[in-house]
Structures are given as C-alpha cells and as structure tokens.
C-alpha cells in the first residue's frame, strides 16, 4: 500500500458498520467520489485491497481524506447517494447525459386530481411522494391504486364514459360533474397510503391473497404477495427526501465531558445534501450552547440561511430569529418540535455525532502516536505542558503555562507566573524560562504530583537548553521529555540533537505541538493585553489625559515603575508636555505603584 494512504487505512478500520454514504476528498478538500454502502467499513476497506482496478488506483492516489454520513437503512443510503452526486457532481462518479433521477408519484392540483408517475417536479401546487428507487415496485403499487380506487386517468373532458369507466377503474368524472365529494374521498385514501397509513389496504390484499391460494390460483397469489411487499416498502417513511418541505437545517448537539460535537444536517429542496460538524470545547449547557452556536453560525458573512432551522433542545428563539433575519435579510424560522420525522432525523444526527467524536479522538490518538515516534518517546504524550514568555518592553515579564490532555486543552491546568528574577527593563527569555521551569517542577516534585509526559518550549535551541538545564538540576531529565518549537521555521529541537526535525505542513503531530505553542502564546498575550489595558485606563484617570494620550504615555514612558525612574523634566521632554502635566503623571504613577494594581497567579 502506498505510504500516503497509511493514515487513511487506519481510519477505515474505525468506520461504522452501518449503512450510509462515503465521500472521498482530494488534498484541496474537493469531493472526488461519492458512494453508498450497506456496511461502510466493509465497503471502504475494498479500496485498500491490492487487487483493485486501474481506475480505482488512480482515484486512490488522489484521495487525502474520507468522510461518512450514516443512514437508518440501505434504502436511505441509496437516496442520499443520488442527492449528493447531483449536488456535487464528483469527477470520479458517473456523469449521465440523461440525468432523469428517480421516479415520484404526483397528485395533481386539478379539481379531479390525477395520480401518476413522474420524474419532474412542477411548482403548480401538485403533491409529490418519493422519490422511489425501485421503479418496478412503484409501477406495481400504482397499478394496485388504479385498480382499487376509481381515479381519473384522462387529461381532457369527454362527452362519453372512457374505457377505464367501463373496466370499473374510474368514477366517470371525465364526463360527470356531480362526483366531487365522492372523488375527494378516493384521493384522500390514496394520500393515506402514500403517507404510510396502509393497514386497511394491506388487510384487503392479505384476504385476496388467501382467497387466491384457496382457489389454487397460485399465479395470482404470487402477484398479490409481490404487491403486498412492494406496498410495504414504498410506504416506508423516507427521511432522506422530503418533497413537500422547503430548505431546512437540523442541528443536534452531542455533549461529552471534554468535547461537544455539533451536527448540522442540511436539506436543500427537501434533499439531504450536506453534513457539517463543528467541535466545541466550551463548558456551556446544551441550551446555552445551542443559542450561542445558532447565533454565530448563521450570522457569519457567507453563511446561507435556510427557510427553517430545526433544533432538538427547546430554547428562547425570538431574539435569535429576529437578529438572523435582520442581519441576513431572511425570513427563517427556528423550530423545536418532536414528530416522527424529526425523531428519525435526530437518530441519524446522533449516529453521525458519535462517529465524528470517535473519529476526532482517533485522529488525536494517531497524532499522539506519531508524535511519540518522532520524538522517540517510550510512552504516549498524553499530558503536554507548554510555556511562553511575554513582557511589556522588558517590564512586567510573565510566563504562561498551558496544559493539554490527549491533544485537547485542559484549562484547569493553565497558569500564569510573574517572573521575579529580572530587573525592570531587562529582557532575558532564557533567564525567565529557567525560573518558570524551576518553580513549576520543583513544586510538582515537592508535592509528589504527576509530571507531564512532554514539555514544549516556545523557541529554539537556546530556550530548549535553558529548560533542559533546570530539568537536569532537578534530576528529572529522564522522566519527562522536553522539546522546543521555533516559530518561523516550525522546526522541532530536542536536547543532545544537533539537527532539528522539520515536519511537513499539515502533519498531525506537528499540529498538536503548534496548538500547544499557539495556546501558550495566546494565553501570555491575553494576560499582557489585560495588563496593558489596565495601565492605559489608569493613565486616562489623570485630569487632562484622554484615551489617546494615555495610550501614548504607555508607549513612550512605559509602566509606573519606569516613570518613577524619570524626573519631571525628562517626562515633559519625552512627552512634549508642560511641567505641570509632567508632575501630575509622576504623582499618579507613585500612587498607583503603591497600590500594585496588577495581580498574577503563581
């Protein structure tokens, strides 16, 4: 098997064994092929066999990812496949010149409606039922309906009864005008059948079948048995296609202790055409998460808002609906209702959510396994701690610590440390790293707490050496692995290794390290922004100092302690202000420094 398919092959082993559709994507996230299966895992596995056709080999050379959508039955998978292929027109799927689609049953909107098979939808108020995959079964049921119910077949009026009237298959509405009420009852019965309410007709068919057997008319009995089976199959509610509905999204949130999967099943013209899954690590309850997600998701710039948004958790929707409709100039509705149809769609959403969460965890596990091998670790890096140093022009230096468990942020483990070993104005990242590593791991050792599996330092060889020297001093260099990740080149450095490790962009192992590094960087910058904002806002409390001038004081003079090192003349010269204002700034800084207006966790 080609090396670039190894990760896909592992993913296939974890696919569900239920029915559904699979989508094969290129490196550029373009859908190359869409297929359906009774057993997704078994079907997709076939693409990884040694003996596959030349065309399949060409396809698999271009496949970078595989996604699946589970369904409740093989029948629904077939309909979904049809809908998806029509929507996306993948390069490797068959392109039919005569893309006539599957047949439907149409009940016209005429005074005396006709009931017939069609493959085309006309928006004239007619009712459509289907589509149906097996045209033969559809023909059998239509034949049964035509023989059981005396419906109109003729397109035009006639002065004389038609052949169907003489055969007992028509009431004669083509030439009579007094049968509207009777005819309406016949059509209502047909609607009941097509909506799955067929028990009475099934009973009648069963009686006729038994009578045929008694008469030893086995040919008729076999035909009646086929009709009965076809009737049951065609009347089953198909949740993949909803011909009499407008476009709609169904949103389901599946929550676990550490992660939420938000599944959006998108229907277009009544057909399921897309599955969108978002992962969320927030700690909101389901109702609050539902409200926040809908607001953010549908107010995004390029998001197309459907006619209806169905949710499975009852929330207050009035303000959210108003906001979406005003911002997007739409008339959407947010609906929470429990019907037979929505329950079935929810079951499909739950299935896809569980698969997505399992796949997400499996992807993380594979990435951690890859990282373990790359760093030559003896165990999986289940717990990673990342560090970053930040300061304000050499002042207020802090170190941020972020913790990741199984590749996901563990926010209870986050810390921010005030660095005490540096003088005001002193910039020394190596010294800061030594201090924070010493403080962090001395505490863990003294309190007999578990060490992380991996420590990540934001920086290069110098920062790595500083951290490693402290670990050696604590005699834990063999108990925990430490590495550094340089920002620009994205090169991984390890102790006692002269050459760094350069991984390809998009490598899952590299992405885990980048996530840890970026989160540590974000945390440090976030703290410093808060600190900077507090200082700036405090400067603006000086009489005569506005927002812009307060910002300029911070930029030009620095923090309170920096200002204490200057006299009034120096302040006036640097800020280009008079002595009176310089004295105010100096006095204010002295007062604020005494209050010690900032605080840091340690």
From Swiss-Prot:
Domain of life where this protein originates: Bacteria
Protein's organism: Borrelia hermsii (strain HS1 / DAH)
A single Gene Ontology CC term? excinuclease repair complex
Where would I find the GIY-YIG domain in this sequence? 17-94
Compartment(s) of residence? Cytoplasm
> Which NCBIfam families does the entry mention?
PRK14670.1, uvrC
Q: Which GO terms describe its biological process?
A: nucleotide-excision repair; SOS response
Quaternary structure and interacting proteins, as annotated: Interacts with UvrB in an incision complex.
Q: What is this protein called?
A: UvrABC system protein C
- Tell me the function of this protein: The UvrABC repair system catalyzes the recognition and processing of DNA lesions. UvrC both incises the 5' and 3' sides of the lesion. The N-terminal half is responsible for the 3' incision and the C-terminal half is responsible for the 5' incision.
Similarity annotation? Belongs to the UvrC family.
Alphabetically sorted, this entry's keywords are:
Cytoplasm, DNA damage, DNA excision, DNA repair, Excision nuclease, SOS response
Single GO term (MF): excinuclease ABC activity
One matching Pfam family: UVR
Kindly indicate whether the keyword DNA damage belongs to this entry.
yes
What the entry lists under CDD domains is as follows:
GIY-YIG_UvrC_Cho
Domain spans labelled UVR: 199-234
């Amino acid at each position: 098997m080609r090396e670039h398919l190894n990760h896909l092959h592992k993913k296939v082993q974890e696919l569900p064994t239920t029915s559904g559709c699979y989508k094969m994507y290129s490196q550029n996230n373009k859908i190359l092929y869409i297929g359906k299966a009774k057993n997704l895992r078994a079907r997709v596995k076939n693409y990884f066999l040694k003996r596959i056709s030349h065309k399949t080999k060409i396809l698999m050379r271009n496949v970078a990812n595989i996604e699946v959508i589970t369904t409740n039955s093989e029948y629904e998978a077939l309909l979904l496949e049809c809908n998806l292929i029509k929507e996306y027109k993948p390069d490797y799927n068959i392109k039919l010149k005569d893309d006539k689609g599957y047949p439907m049953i149409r009940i016209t909107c005429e005074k005396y409606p006709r009931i017939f098979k069609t493959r085309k939808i006309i928006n004239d108020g007619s009712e459509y039922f289907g589509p149906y995959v097996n045209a033969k079964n559809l023909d059998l049921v239509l034949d049964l309906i035509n023989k059981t119910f005396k419906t109109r077949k003729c397109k035009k009026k006639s002065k004389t009864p038609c052949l169907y009237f003489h055969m007992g298959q028509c009431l004669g509405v083509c030439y009579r005008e007094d049968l509207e009420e009777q005819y309406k009852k016949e059509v209502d019965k047909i609607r009941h059948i097509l909506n799955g309410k067929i028990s009475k007709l099934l009973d009648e068919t069963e009686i006729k079948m038994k009578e045929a057997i008694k008469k030893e008319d086995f040919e008729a009995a076999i035909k009646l048995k086929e009709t009965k089976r076809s009737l049951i199959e065609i009347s089953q509610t198909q949740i993949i296609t909803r011909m009499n509905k407008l476009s709609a999204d169904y949103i389901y949130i599946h929550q676990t202790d550490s992660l939420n999967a938000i599944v959006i099943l998108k229907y277009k013209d009544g057909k399921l055409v897309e599955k969108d899954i978002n992962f969320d690590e927030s700690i909101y309850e389901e109702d609050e998460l539902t409200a926040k997600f809908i607001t953010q998701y549908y107010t995004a710039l390029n998001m197309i808002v459907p006619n209806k948004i169905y949710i499975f958790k009852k929330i207050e929707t009035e303000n959210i609906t108003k906001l979406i409709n005003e911002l997007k100039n739409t008339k959407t509705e947010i609906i929470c209702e429990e019907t037979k149809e929505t329950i079935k769609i929810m079951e499909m959403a739950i299935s896809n959510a569980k698969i997505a969460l399992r796949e997400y965890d499996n992807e993380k596990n594979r990435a951690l396994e890859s990282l373990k091998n790359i760093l030559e670790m003896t165990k999986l890096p289940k717990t990673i701690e990342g560090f970053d140093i930040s300061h304000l022009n050499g002042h207020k230096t802090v170190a941020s610590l972020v913790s990741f468990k199984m590749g996901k942020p563990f926010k209870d483990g986050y810390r921010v440390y005030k660095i005490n070993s540096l003088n005001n104005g002193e910039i020394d990242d190596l010294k800061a790293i030594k201090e924070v590593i010493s403080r962090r791991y001395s505490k863990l050792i003294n309190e007999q707490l578990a060490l992380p599996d991996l420590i990540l330092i934001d920086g290069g060889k110098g920062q790595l050496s500083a951290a490693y020297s402290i670990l050696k001093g604590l005699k834990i260099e063999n108990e925990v692995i430490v590495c550094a990740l340089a920002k620009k080149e994205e090169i991984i450095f390890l102790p006692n290794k002269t050459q760094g490790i350069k991984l390809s962009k998009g490598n899952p192992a590299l992405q885990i390290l980048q996530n840890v590094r970026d989160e540590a960087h974000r945390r440090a910058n976030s703290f410093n922004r808060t600190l900077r904002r507090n200082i700036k806002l405090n400067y603006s409390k000086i009489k005569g100092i506005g927002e812009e001038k307060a910002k300029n004081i911070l930029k030009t003079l620095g923090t309170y302690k920096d200002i204490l090192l200057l006299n009034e003349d120096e302040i006036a010269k640097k800020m280009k202000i008079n002595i009176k204002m310089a004295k105010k700034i100096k006095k204010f800084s002295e007062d604020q420094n005494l209050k010690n207006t900032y605080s840091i966790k340690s």
